[in-house]
């Protein structure tokens, strides 16, 4: 019953997250934070409604776990964006969250597929999200490094080196948190 309302909450959230990602590219920080925040609030409201309806934390099935993935990705994205102002991070986190939302929408059979007990821990979903963000940031640092090594012409690399360093620092921080 509660999953039948998911599409409403999901569509509203994804539209708001996408608006926030677009606003980040347009240097409209206030709009980016506001729309991403409203999207997170709407999505979290659905998680809370599900929690109250089920009378337990929604962590037992694959579908419920993907809800947490979809929630934590834009949250991690907005945190990184607020600190380092990387315009692409909100687009990336929104895209990943949208993939998990779509899996929940298009594969309803996972809503009842129970996870093994070890994966029902409240630490499992944040752990996976933090690892995904860590690998994404470290991958971006590798791409930036390859660009600087083989394609960048000229001596103006101070800004690019700082970005690469920051991506590495944040990626390793997320990796450490994930452990």
Describe the role of every protein-language-model region:
Residues 1-179:
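Polytopic transmembrane helical bundles with strong interfacial aromatic enrichment
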């Amino acid at each position: 019953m509660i999953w039948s309302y998911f599409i409403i909450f999901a569509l509203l959230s994804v539209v708001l997250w996408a608006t926030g990602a677009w606003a980040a590219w347009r240097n409209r920080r206030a709009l980016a934070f506001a729309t991403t925040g409203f999207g997170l609030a709407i999505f979290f409201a659905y998680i809370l409604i599900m929690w109250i309806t089920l009378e337990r934390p929604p962590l037992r099935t694959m579908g419920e776990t993907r809800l947490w993935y979809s929630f934590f990705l834009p949250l991690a994205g907005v945190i990184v964006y607020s600190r380092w102002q990387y315009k692409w991070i909100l687009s990336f986190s929104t895209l990943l969250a949208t993939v998990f939302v779509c899996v929940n929408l298009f594969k309803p059979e996972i809503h009842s597929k129970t996870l093994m007990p070890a994966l029902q821990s409240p630490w499992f979903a944040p752990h996976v999200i933090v690892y995904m963000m860590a690998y994404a940031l470290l991958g971006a640092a590798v791409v930036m490094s390859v660009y600087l090594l083989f394609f960048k012409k000229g001596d103006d690399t101070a800004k690019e080196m700082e970005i690469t360093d920051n991506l590495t620092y944040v990626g390793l921080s997320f990796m450490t948190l994930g452990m």
